[in-house]
Regions:
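Positively charged, small/polar-rich N-terminal and surface patches that mediate targeting and assembly
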Residues: 1-86
Length: 86
């Protein structure tokens, strides 16, 4: 991917509040030009060999390939999940 190429980054978060917090920080630091927050989604996943269902929120961040690594690092640093879906 070329450094100036635009990309969308999909991030699940525990709730709308966490999504707003992350969105504000990444836009403030200019790691994303824009953030769209969907306040409620239903996630279905396999955890420890059991199917789990959980309410979450999702962020869609608009950024560039050049900013992606810094964006990902910041999200990992401030996200409440041990291994966030980015």
């Amino acid at each position: 991917m070329e450094k100036n190429q635009n990309c969308l980054v999909y991030v699940t978060v525990k709730d709308e509040g966490e999504g707003l917090s992350i969105a504000q920080k990444v836009v403030e630091k200019r790691l994303a030009a824009c953030a769209n927050l969907h306040p409620q989604i239903k996630s279905i996943f396999n955890y420890q060999n059991q199917i789990q269902t959980q309410d979450e929120a999702v962020l869609i961040l608009k950024t560039t390939a050049q900013a992606y690594d810094k964006l990902e690092s910041l999200i990992v640093e401030i996200h409440s999940y041990d291994d966030p879906c980015i």
